[in-house]
Amino acid sequence: MLQLVEFRDWHPELIDSVDWYFMPVANPDGYEYSHSTDRLWRKTRSGAKADQRWGKKKCYGVDPNRNWDFHWGEGSTSSSDPCTDDYRGPWAFSEPETKAIADFILTRKDQIKIYLTLHSYSQMWLVPWGYKNEKPKDYYNMYVLAEKGVEALQAVRGTDYLLGTAAELLYTSSGMVSNGSVNLTCKLRCTSHI
């Protein structure tokens, strides 16, 4: 963002020919909580739910990266237990954060060509699919575009990033933002773990 604003003259075509949408923090309450209380917190801070195992402990939040509608709730890496870090929520888009982002994208689905989300921890660029060990038909195109991003980071920072599907590099998981059905019209959908 800073480069686009402060160094506009370097690449004016990037400003003049493209509409840019930035959402600096998609989970503001979770972000604040991770800075004030628990630095590894990844969920939202939505209302407390009773622990399903014991019924006494109050558990907060939903993992926004398991709350998207595409194959929501499938597999073993999104939990129905509100006390786990990967709790998917009671239904897809149950969280106002994920619902707002999905609505924003849907109203611009014919305009948005690239959807990039920055995620915390690791040095990976993940492209779909994450919910299964298969690649979508546009995988090669996404891979080539993402590879350019990885190479640019390498050139500037000297940092190596792994590139592949979440299923290849991590594990299969459903309800992820980069797999979300609202993003299926984008030419590039990936998550950069920084």
What residue ranges belong to the model's regions?
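Short helix-loop-beta-strand segments that form the rim/entrance of peptidase-like active sites
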Residues: 1-34
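Metallocarboxypeptidase
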Residues: 41-194
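"Short basic amphipathic alpha-helical interaction patches in structured regions
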Residues: 36-38
